[in-house]
Amino acid sequence: MYKVFLKRFFFLFLVISQIRGELIIIHCGILIDGESDKPQKVMSILIQEDKIIDVTEGYVNAGENDNLIDLNNFTVLPGLMDMHVHLSGESNPKKYMERFTLNLDDFAYQSTMFAERTLLAGFTTVRDLGGPINNSLRNAINSGKVVGPRIFSAGKSIATTGGHADPTNGMKYELMGDPGPSKGVVNGIADSRKAVRQRYKNGADLIKITATGGVLSVAKNGENPQFIEDEILEIVKTANDYGMHVAAHAHGAEGMKRAIRSGVKSIEHGTLMDKEAMGLMKKMGTYYVPTISAGEFVAEKAEIEGYYPEVVRPKAKKIGPKIKETFKRAYESGVK
């Protein structure tokens, strides 16, 4: 009786919605919904006010004012999510010179191309974890000016002096200067707090820190810890005060464990994660974002003479291939 009532109620709801012209109806030849054990054939998805309100068997008839999307010859599945992207640029042999040859306007224009490519590849939601224009790109997409996925933006990453995301790494001394918290370079608790507040002011959705060295930075160490624990604690505390979580880039185990103990929400890359780190992640509820394809990519490109600066190549060859193996161990141990 309850099921009959629901069906009648839903039929009435459909009639009302059709009269108001509020429905988008998608006819799916094959539907992979992410929950069923196998693909389902001849299905309809009903959408109202940007929300899926029902998925039902058969092809629901569209009302006069409804928007029907006929995909009866296609396979339909939910949009994919990528939790670690950088839409302002791409890896190429000219990347390191682009810091000196491209303006922010140039990065902004090319980011629209990368955003559209990402959406057309099936990714409808992404976390952009560090870039010069990602807040503005998100706003442009949300306002309908640019085609792209829904973006949760970290704004500019937060690093320490000489750390992985210090924008002056590899420059001559006269150009290095002292970038400071607004540019994402911190030293000490006060700087750490200020950098988070600056990103909140700039419209970030979350905070990204580089807890260890990195592969692509122009620095010889790709795994050393780069924050003291008190700095990370302050970043996490301040971010939480402003309703944001913290994602931590980390390759080496020690810097990773400092970040996990401090309460970051996710570990990015996690290449040299050890058993202790895995145990801490399970205890703290920390998520793991392995970036497997990035590891494979940098290892492959490191074999090409001149693709990366010489200081980067050995790091890419060492760290890149290990991510896939680490992911397997982390998954088997129960890390989320």
Predicted regions and their residues:
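Sec-dependent N-terminal signal peptides
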Residues: F5-S17
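Histidine-rich, glycine-flanked metal-binding segment
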Residues: I24-I25, L31, E35-L77
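Divalent metal-coordination and catalytic microenvironments
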Residues: G29, I45, D50, N73, ...
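Metal-associated gating/positioning segment near the N- to mid-region
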Residues: F74-S143, T161-T168, D230, E254, ...
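Divalent metal-dependent hydrolysis catalytic cores, especially in the metallo-beta-lactamase
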Residues: Q110-L137, G148-S157, A204-S217, H245, ...
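Histidine/acidic-residue-rich, glycine-tolerant segments that coordinate divalent metal ions
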Residues: N135, N142-R258, M273
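Active-site core of metal-dependent hydrolases
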Residues: T161, T210-E325, E332-K336
